[in-house]
Amino acid sequence: MVGSRTSPIFNALRVELNAREAELVEIPLIQPADPFLDMAGEDLRRRIFLTENENGDSLCLRPEFTIPVCRNHIALNAATPKRYAYLGEVFRQRRDGAAEFLQAGIEDLGAADEAASDARSLADALSCVKAIAPDAPLEIVLGDQSVFAGMLKALGLPQGWRKKLLRSFGDAHSMDLALAELTGTQRRDPLPESLAVLVAEGDEIGLARMLEAEMLEAGISPGAGRTPVEIARRLIEKEDLAATHFPAAALDLLRQFLAIRVSLDMAAVTLRAFAADNALDLGAVLQKFEARADAIAQAGIEMKDIIYDASFGRPLDYYTGLVYEIRDASNRQDGVLAGGGRYDRLLTMLGACEAIPGVGFSIWLDRLQALAGEKQ
């Protein structure tokens, strides 16, 4: 395993987390797989170590902490606001490097002041990184999925296309493919006739049954990766979306928006000018954006040191607003030290009886250890 529970970095981070009014929780290593498969995003789904218990239930080694920390909060029926800290192993299949490594972080649940809790999350993550590597050159990149969602709405895109593009947010390759589909320039491979009939009829149940049968016949577990129901839903959705094309001028505006990359102190004025020049109604989302930027400044973080990238997202499906990464500025290829964001719908999706907003971050201890120059 990269990193160690006995290393000075591990202990120093424990001290940092304890100083931030967060309850340190222990989360089991073995987790039910379905919440991760349903909500964690395509990139993480491919990396999960899956297994089954004797009852056939899908289980996995813990691939991240946010989902199980939120499930634990719901199971305890705990009051909010509540802050949880964690420090422990996660397991992901990697082409290179160790599959088991340490993460630390804080999940802030139920805070009423969204702007202040967003700013606190970023400030906490930055403080933890600087406590371990005080002299390291850092780059902070911030995005906002809610601003992107507001842009899609202002352009008048149908709901189905909004959902598809939101799923692609932050993944440049996926976004390029989605935009090519929207213009009708991306040709789709034809489906087998037996599947095509069910897709054309919108028969999600029948299609899922056929897909499950084909997966079993091919020796593929229906619980490995996307479920047959999810695949069926996506195929039907693709058929519906294929019939929709969007004006080239509107798509050009969307590409211009995604190209915006400025320091945070210039972001709000840049976005307002873009909206005004193109008659786009982004007032509500930009008001929240500005409130957060003000809160970040009040938290003592220099806004000129933060990059706002309109196309920046993180490869986890549960984010809804703020997303950010703290990176090693000297390592552009694999330099993400910490990442986080807001996930206001996640707890409801996990079974909470009422809406509970959340924001949190994770730190990669192996990368932070390498940056700090600590000997393993």
From Swiss-Prot:
Keywords: Amino-acid biosynthesis, Cytoplasm, Histidine biosynthesis. Pathway: Amino-acid biosynthesis; L-histidine biosynthesis; L-histidine from 5-phospho-alpha-D-ribose 1-diphosphate: step 1/9. The keyword Phosphoprotein does not apply. It is found in: Cytoplasm. SUPFAM superfamilies: Class II aaRS and biotin synthetases. GO terms for biological process: histidyl-tRNA aminoacylation; L-histidine biosynthetic process. Its main location: cytoplasm. HAMAP family: HisZ. This is ATP phosphoribosyltransferase regulatory subunit. It comes from Brucella ovis (strain ATCC 25840 / 63/290 / NCTC 10512).
